[in-house]
C-alpha cells in the first residue's frame, strides 16, 4: 500500500503558522513580483479568487472581503516543508518527496489499520508543525493520489484520511473522478479522451491498452494499469551520492518564470537538506531546465549553468538565492518547460 500526503493550501497555511490571527480569514499568496495568485486559503477560494489570477483584477475582492495578501516567501515554505517531510519519514522507511507539499510513503509491511494510521499522521503533523494535511492510501501511487483527492474534497466524511482498500471503493472512486483530474493526464490527453467519449476515470481505465499506448504512450499505459490496481509507477527514493542533486519532471508543462522558480526553490531546498543530513557543504551549484522532448513541433531548449559559490554552504537561504540568480540567466520566455 502507498500513502500520498498532501499539505492543504500549503503556502497560505505556512503564513498562518506564524500569524494565527489569520485563521478563518481569506488569505492569498502572490508570486514574487506580486503578479499572480499562487496559493489560496479555503476562505479565499469560497469568495471566487481563482488560482493563477492576476492580482490587480481581484483587488476589489481583496478590499471587499478584507483578504490578507502576502508575497511568496519560498525560503520559509522550504523550511516548513522539510519539517513536515522529516516527521512523515518516521511513518515509513521508504519516502518519496514528490513536491514541496507532497510525498509518497510505501507502507508495505506495516500491518495496522491504515485509516487510523493516516489520522495519526495527520494529528502528528498538525501538532508538530501547524500545517494541515490530507492522506490518501491505496494499493498503487495513482490510486493513492485519487484517495487523497477524496480525503481533501470530503473532510467531514473522511476526517482527512481515506483508504481505497476494496474493489468496490476503487470502482466508486473511478466513477467519481473526471479524466482531467487524473494524476498526470494533463489537458492535451484529456481532450483526446473527451473526443472519444471518455469523461470519467472509469472510462479511461476501460479503454483498450492498445489505444492508450498509441495515443498516450507508455506513460499513459502505466497510469492506466496503476488505476486498475496493478502497481506500475514505482517509488523514486533518494540515493546516497557524493554529488547531491534533486531533479524531477514537472507534472505539467510550465511556461512562466515564477512557476519554474517555485520548483527550483523546492528542489534546491531538498538538496540543502541532503547536504546537512550528511554534514556536507556545497562549493558549486548547477541549475538546469529543459523543454518537453515529446513536443517535437516546438523549439527545444536545454540550458544549464554552473555557479561557483563565494563560500562553501549548506544553507537553504544562500543556496536558493544563488539558484534563483542562475535561473534568471538561463530562463527564456515562450518555452514550455518539463
Walk through the language-model features, giving the residues of each.
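Gly/Gly-Pro- and Ser/Thr-rich, intrinsically disordered tail segments characteristic of DNA damage-repair
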Residues: 1-225, 235
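DNA-contacting surface of Y-family translesion DNA polymerases
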Residues: 194-337
Amino acid at each position: 500500500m502507498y500513502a500520498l500526503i498532501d499539505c492543504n493550501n500549503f503556502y497560505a497555511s505556512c503564513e498562518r503558522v506564524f500569524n494565527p490571527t489569520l485563521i478563518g480569514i481569506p488569505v492569498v499568496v502572490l508570486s514574487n513580483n506580486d503578479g499572480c495568485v499562487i496559493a489560496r486559503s479555503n476562505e479565499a477560494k469560497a469568495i471566487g479568487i481563482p488560482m493563477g489570477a492576476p492580482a490587480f483584477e481581484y483587488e476589489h475582492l481583496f478590499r471587499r472581503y478584507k483578504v490578507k495578501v502576502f508575497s511568496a516567501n519560498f525560503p520559509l515554505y522550504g523550511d516548513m516543508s522539510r519539517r513536515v517531510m522529516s516527521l512523515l519519514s518516521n511513518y515509513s522507511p521508504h519516502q518519496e518527496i514528490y513536491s514541496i507539499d507532497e510525498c509518497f510513503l510505501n507502507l508495505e509491511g506495516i500491518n495496522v489499520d491504515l485509516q487510523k494510521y493516516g489520522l495519526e499522521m495527520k494529528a502528528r503533523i498538525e501538532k508538530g508543525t501547524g500545517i494541515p494535511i490530507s492522506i490518501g492510501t491505496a494499493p498503487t501511487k495513482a490510486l493513492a493520489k485519487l484517495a487523497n483527492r477524496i480525503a481533501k474534497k470530503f473532510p467531514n466524511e473522511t476526517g482527512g484520511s481515506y483508504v481505497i482498500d476494496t474493489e468496490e471503493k476503487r470502482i466508486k472512486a473511478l466513477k467519481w473522478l473526471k479524466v482531467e483530474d487524473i494524476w498526470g493526464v494533463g489537458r492535451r490527453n484529456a481532450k483526446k479522451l473527451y473526443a472519444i467519449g471518455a469523461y470519467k476515470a472509469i472510462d479511461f481505465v476501460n479503454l483498450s491498452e492498445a489505444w492508450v499506448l498509441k495515443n498516450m504512450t507508455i506513460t499513459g499505459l502505466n497510469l492506466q494499469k496503476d488505476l486498475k490496481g496493478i502497481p506500475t509507477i514505482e517509488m523514486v527514493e533518494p540515493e546516497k551520492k557524493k554529488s547531491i542533486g534533486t531533479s524531477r519532471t514537472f507534472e505539467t508543462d510550465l511556461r512562466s518564470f515564477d512557476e519554474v522558480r517555485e520548483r527550483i526553490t523546492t528542489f534546491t531546498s531538498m538538496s540543502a537538506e541532503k547536504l546537512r543530513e550528511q554534514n556536507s557543504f556545497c562549493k558549486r551549484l548547477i541549475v538546469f531546465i529543459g523543454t518537453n522532448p515529446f513536443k517535437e513541433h516546438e523549439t527545444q531548449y536545454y540550458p544549464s549553468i554552473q555557479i561557483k559559490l563565494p563560500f562553501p554552504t549548506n544553507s537553504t537561504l544562500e543556496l536558493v538565492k544563488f539558484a534563483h540568480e542562475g535561473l534568471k540567466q538561463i530562463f527564456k520566455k515562450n518555452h514550455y518547460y518539463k
